C-alpha cells in the first residue's frame, strides 16, 4: 500500500532595470561587461538545464510510483484478506478465552486454599489470644498475692517491734524494783547489826523484826513471782525473735520465688508477644495476597467481559455486512497493554503508524519554509555559489538531525492502573474490528484522492522553449522499499534550430534518500484532519502550475531573443537543492562556440528598454507510505533565475520623459 504526497512552494523575486542601461551600449567597457554577463547567463542556463533534468527524473519516479500504486490498489480490491484476518483473530480470542477460563479455575482453587489457610490462622490467632489472656489473669493474681504477703510481713514486723519495746520496758522496771528491795534488805541488816540490845528497844525491835520477818515471805513470793514473770517474758522474747527470724526467712524465700516466677512469666509474655507479632505479619501477608487475588479476579472478569463485547461487536458487524442491516456496537474503553514479543505486527499498529504522519508533515513544512528563507536571503545578499552550497549543506544536515530526532519513537514504560506485588503475565490486547474497518476505508479514500490530485495534464505546446528542444532519457534511480528496480544512467540530447545536436554525458542517478524514523504512536488522533490540509495543498499546487506555465512561456521568449550557442550537460548532476561547488567547469565549450556566443549575444540593432530578473524557488516534500513502514524524505529543489528582456524600444525623443 503506497501513498505519496508532494508539497511545492514557489517564491518569485523580480528586479527591474531602468532605461539608463541604453546609455552605456557604445562603450568598450560595456562590451566587456556584456560578454561577462553572457558567460554568466550561459552558466545559469546550464544550471537550469541540470535542474530540469532532476525535475524530469523526479516526475518520472512519481509516474512510476503512482502507476505501481494504482496496480496495487486494483489488486487489493480483488483480495479478500480481512475476513481471514478477522477469522484468525476470533480464533485467537477464543483460545485466549479458554486459557483465561482455565486460569480462572486455577485461581479459584488457589483462593479456596488461601481462604482455608486464613481460617486456620484466624483460629490459631484466637487461641493464642485466649491463652495470653489467661496468662495475664494468672500474673495479676500472683501480683495481688505477693502484695498481700508483703503487707502481712510489714504488719508482723511492726507488731514484733512493739512487743520488743514492751519487754524492754518491763524488764527495766523489774530490775529497778529488785534493786530497791535489795537496798532495803541491806539497810535493814545494817540497822539490826548496829542497833544495841536494849530490852524495850529490843522488844520494839523484836516486834519490828517479827513484822519484817512476816513481810519477808511476802516479798520473797513477790520476788519469785517477778522472776517467773521475767523468765516468761524472756521466753516470749526468744519465741518472738525466732518467729521474726522465721518470718523474715519466709518473706525472703517468697520474694525470691516470686522474682523467679515473675522473670519466667515475663519471658513467656515476651515469647507470646513475638509469636503474636509474627502471626499478625503472616495474617497481614495472607490478607494482602487475598486482596490481590480478588483484584486480579476482578481484572480477569473485566477482561472476559471486554472480550465478550469484542466478539459480540465482530459477530454483529459480520452479520450486518452479510444481511445489510445496521448494527449497534458495544464499545468499551480499556487501557492498552504491551503486546507479546512472539506475535507479529497486527492491524492496530499499522493504523497507528499511518495515523501519525500529519504532525511530522507540519514540522517538515516549517523546516522547508525556513530553508527557503535562508536560501533566498543568501541569494539576495549576493553570496558566492561555494558559500551558498556550504550553508545549504549545513542547514540540510541540521534539519535531517532534527527530523530524525522528532521522528524517533520513545518507548515509555507501561503505566498500569493497578500494580500487584507479584508480576503477572498481561494478556495481549485485541483491536476493535469496527475501528479498523473505518480507518482502512478512510485510508483508501485518502489514497484515491491523492491519486486523483496528482494526475497532471499533458504539457501544452507553447509552454516548451522555442528554438531549443531537450530530450531526457533513462530510467528511475530511486530504490522503492517494496518494488525493486535497477538504476540506469540517463542521457541528455540538446538540439537547436540551427540543427546542432549535443549529447551530454551520463547523468548519475539520484542517490537514495535517507529513511526516517518511525513516528510516535500518540499522533494517531490527527488522521481526521488530513483532508483539510490536502485541500489546501491542492489549491497551492494549482497556483504553482499556473506560475510554472507562465515561466515556460517567458523562457521561450528569452531563448528566441538571446539564441544562446550549444551547451552540454555537466558531468555529474547534483541532488536537488544542492549546487556542487566542486565542479567549476560546468560549461564545456569549444572556441568556435565562444566566438559564436560573443558575436550573437548582442546582434540585435537595439538593446531592450528594460531588463527584469525573476527568481523562482521550488521546494518539494515527498512522503511515502507502505504497509511495512513509513518512509519520508524531502527534496528542496531548484532556484531558477530568469532574465526577461523586453524588445520594445523607445524613440530618442521619449528618453527624456
Swiss-Prot record:
Per UniProt, which keywords does this protein have?
Cell membrane, Coiled coil, Cytoplasm, Cytoskeleton, Eye lens protein, Intermediate filament, Membrane, Phosphoprotein, Repeat
In terms of Pfam families, this protein maps to: Filament
Region of interest (Tail), ranges? 319-657
The UniProt annotation puts the region (Coil 1A) at 39-73
Q: Which SUPFAM superfamilies does the protein's record reference?
A: Intermediate filament protein, coiled coil region
Instruction: Show the SMART domains listed in the entry.
Output: Filament
Give the subcellular location.
Answer: Cell membrane; Cytoplasm; Cytoplasm, Cytoskeleton; Cytoplasm, Cell cortex
Residues covered by region (Linker 1):
74-82
| Cellular component, GO, one term | intermediate filament
Tissue specificity, in the record's words, reads: Detected in eye lens fiber cells (at protein level). Detected in embryonic eye lens.
| Role summary | Required for the correct formation of lens intermediate filaments.
Q: Which family does it belong to?
A: Belongs to the intermediate filament family.
PANTHER family with a match to the protein in the record: FILENSIN (PTHR14069:SF0)
**Descriptive protein name:** Filensin
Recorded source organism is Gallus gallus
Gene name of the record: BFSP1
Amino acid at each position: 500500500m503506497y501513498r505519496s504526497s508532494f508539497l511545492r512552494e514557489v517564491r518569485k523575486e523580480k528586479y527591474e532595470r531602468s532605461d539608463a542601461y541604453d546609455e552605456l551600449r557604445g562603450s568598450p567597457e560595456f562590451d566587456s561587461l556584456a560578454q561577462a554577463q553572457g558567460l554568466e547567463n550561459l552558466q545559469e542556463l546550464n544550471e537550469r538545464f541540470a535542474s530540469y533534468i532532476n525535475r524530469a527524473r523526479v516526475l518520472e519516479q512519481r509516474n512510476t510510483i503512482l502507476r505501481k500504486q494504482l496496480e496495487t490498489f486494483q489488486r487489493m480490491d480483488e483480495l479478500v484478506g480481512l475476513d481471514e484476518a478477522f477469522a484468525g483473530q476470533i480464533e485467537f480470542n477464543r483460545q485466549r478465552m479458554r486459557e483465561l477460563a482455565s486460569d480462572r479455575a486455577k485461581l479459584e482453587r488457589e483462593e479456596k486454599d488461601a481462604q482455608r489457610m486464613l481460617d486456620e490462622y484466624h483460629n490459631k490467632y484466637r487461641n493464642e489470644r485466649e491463652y495470653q489472656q489467661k496468662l495475664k489473669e494468672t500474673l495479676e493474681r500472683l501480683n495481688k498475692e505477693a502484695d498481700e504477703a508483703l503487707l502481712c510481713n510489714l504488719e508482723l514486723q511492726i507488731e514484733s517491734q512493739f512487743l520488743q519495746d514492751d519487754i524492754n520496758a518491763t524488764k527495766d522496771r523489774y530490775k529497778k524494783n529488785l534493786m530497791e528491795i535489795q537496798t532495803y534488805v541491806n539497810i535493814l541488816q545494817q540497822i539490826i547489826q548496829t542497833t544495841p540490845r536494849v530490852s524495850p528497844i529490843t522488844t520494839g525491835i523484836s516486834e519490828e523484826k517479827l513484822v519484817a520477818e512476816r513481810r519477808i515471805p511476802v516479798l520473797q513470793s513477790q520476788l519469785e513471782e517477778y522472776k517467773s514473770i521475767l523468765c516468761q517474758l524472756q521466753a516470749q522474747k526468744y519465741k518472738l525473735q525466732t518467729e521474726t527470724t522465721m518470718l523474715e526467712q519466709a518473706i525472703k524465700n517468697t520474694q525470691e520465688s516470686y522474682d523467679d516466677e515473675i522473670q519466667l512469666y515475663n519471658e513467656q509474655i515476651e515469647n507470646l508477644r513475638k509469636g503474636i507479632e509474627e502471626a499478625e505479619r503472616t495474617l497481614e501477608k495472607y490478607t494482602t495476597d487475598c486482596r490481590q487475588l480478588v483484584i486480579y479476579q476482578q481484572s480477569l472478569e473485566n477482561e472476559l467481559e471486554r472480550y465478550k463485547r469484542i466478539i459480540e461487536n465482530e459477530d454483529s458487524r459480520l452479520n450486518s455486512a452479510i444481511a445489510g442491516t445496521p448494527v449497534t456496537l458495544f464499545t468499551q474503553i480499556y487501557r492498552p497493554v504491551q503486546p507479546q514479543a512472539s506475535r507479529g505486527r497486527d492491524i492496530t499498529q499499522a493504523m497507528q503508524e499511518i495515523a501519525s504522519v500529519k504532525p511530522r508533515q507540519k514540522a517538515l513544512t516549517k523546516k522547508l519554509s525556513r530553508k527557503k528563507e535562508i536560501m533566498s536571503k543568501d541569494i539576495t545578499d549576493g553570496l558566492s555559489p561555494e558559500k551558498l552550497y556550504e550553508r545549504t549543506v549545513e542547514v540540510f544536515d541540521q534539519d535531517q538531525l532534527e527530523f530524525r530526532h522528532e521522528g524517533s519513537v520513545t518507548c515509555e514504560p507501561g503505566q498500569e492502573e493497578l500494580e500487584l506485588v507479584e508480576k503477572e503475565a498481561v494478556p495481549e490486547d485485541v483491536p476493535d474490528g469496527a475501528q479498523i474497518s473505518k480507518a482502512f476505508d478512510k485510508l483508501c479514500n485518502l489514497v484515491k484522492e491523492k491519486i486523483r490530485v496528482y494526475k497532471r495534464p499533458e504539457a501544452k505546446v507553447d509552454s516548451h522553449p522555442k528554438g531549443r528542444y531537450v530530450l531526457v532519457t533513462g530510467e528511475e534511480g530511486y530504490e522503492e522499499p517494496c518494488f525493486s528496480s535497477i538504476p540506469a544512467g540517463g542521457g541528455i540530447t540538446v538540439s537547436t534550430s540551427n540543427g546542432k545536436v549535443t549529447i551530454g554525458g551520463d547523468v548519475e542517478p539520484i542517490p537514495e534518500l535517507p529513511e526516517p524514523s518511525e513516528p510516535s504512536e500518540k499522533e494517531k488522533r490527527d488522521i481526521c484532519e488530513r483532508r483539510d490540509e490536502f485541500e489546501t495543498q491542492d489549491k497551492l499546487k494549482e497556483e504553482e502550475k499556473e506560475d510554472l506555465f507562465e515561466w515556460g512561456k517567458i523562457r521561450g521568449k528569452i531563448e528566441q531573443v538571446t539564441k544562446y550557442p550549444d551547451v552540454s550537460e555537466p558531468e555529474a548532476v547534483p541532488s536537488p537543492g544542492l549546487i556542487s561547488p566542486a565542479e567549476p567547469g560546468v560549461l564545456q565549450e569549444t572556441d568556435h562556440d565562444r566566438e559564436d556566443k560573443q558575436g550573437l549575444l548582442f546582434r540585435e540593432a537595439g538593446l531592450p528598454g528594460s531588463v527584469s530578473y525573476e527568481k523562482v524557488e521550488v521546494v518539494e516534500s515527498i512522503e511515502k507510505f507502505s504497509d511495512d513502514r513509513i518512509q519520508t524524505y524531502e527534496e528542496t529543489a531548484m532556484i531558477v533565475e530568469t532574465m526577461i528582456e523586453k524588445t520594445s524600444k523607445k524613440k530618442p525623443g521619449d528618453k527624456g520623459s
